[in-house]
Amino acid sequence: MDAQLTFKKYLDFSQFPRNWRVCRAAVDWQGSPLLLVDEGKPPYPSGDASTEARIRWFNTLPRARHLVYWDGTSQTTLTLDKSAGIGSFQVQRFGEGWLLGGGRGGRTDVCDNKGRLQRTLDLGDSGNDVQTTSDGHIWVSYSDEEVFGGGVGQHGVVCFDSAGRAIFKYSEFADQNQLPRIDDCYAMNVVNAEEVWLSYYSDFPLVSIKNFQLNRAWKNFGCMNPAFAILGETVISQKCYTRVEGKSQLLRRSISASAQTEPAHAIDEKGVVIDGLFTAIAKGPNFYVLTDTALYELQRNR
């Protein structure tokens, strides 16, 4: 019998206006979720839509973009400055404000706590993921398009300081530690200012980095995409390549014996399976799943 992981509904999207749609989710350094929400963008084209229709949709900007975030149990909605954030699909806390990035051309916007643009950084073109730390470090992971396209993305994962200067390049680190280089970084977990974990294509090792030094590495640990949580000696992740018949899946794996892998069902507090497609987001031990209708948080004590 498959394992069960219990999730609590964190936010029901029915509380949003009808023309609001969650376009991106992340986790901040406090372990709380961050949601980028589009206002007024048309629904995504149907499954039989043409490529041209999908491109038009992708290039259609929303009327406004909002950031929903939490401080403790207090929920806040912030409308972002139209000169920043509209074309972004990454969000993180940054100092007293916000970092909005991931768009084409490498532009990353630094905004104050009111969502007003203050300055821009160039962190490379279209990173897979961006995660920040409370001391101002910016970790960016890159896809194969950037890895093989030249530029800073060729290093697979890069850590930048608060001014946008590269202070750690994974390709150099991998060579120094006899690790495979990154072809495409599928998942990254920046636990805190000292600790970072990576899972990447094509060998799919699990690599633990502490203070920019190799802590531990497991060869051929297995694919995890797009996120994983570290709970002691256990890893919780979304299973790769398994969107079979419209159903996402989770895995629970032991770090101490990586061969011990078991499928896990996501259930709510009433024991009902969270069915259909969902997307995982994580940071440290904090793990959430995002469906079309709600955001759920893993209950770690159950």
Language-model segment annotations:
Residues 9-16, 73-82, 115-122, 166-179, ...:
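A short beta-strand motif characteristic of beta-propeller blades
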Residues 17-30, 43-44, 81-95, 123-135, ...:
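Repeated scaffold domains used in trafficking and secretory/extracellular systems
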Residues 46-96:
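Blade-loop segments of beta-propeller domains
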Residues 51-71, 110-112, 152-165, 248-258:
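Beta-propeller blade signature
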Residues 184, 199, 218-262:
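Loop/turn-rich, solvent-exposed surfaces of beta-rich toroidal or solenoidal domains
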Residues 279-302:
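Blade-level signature of beta-propeller repeat domains, shared across WD40, Kelch, NHL, RCC1
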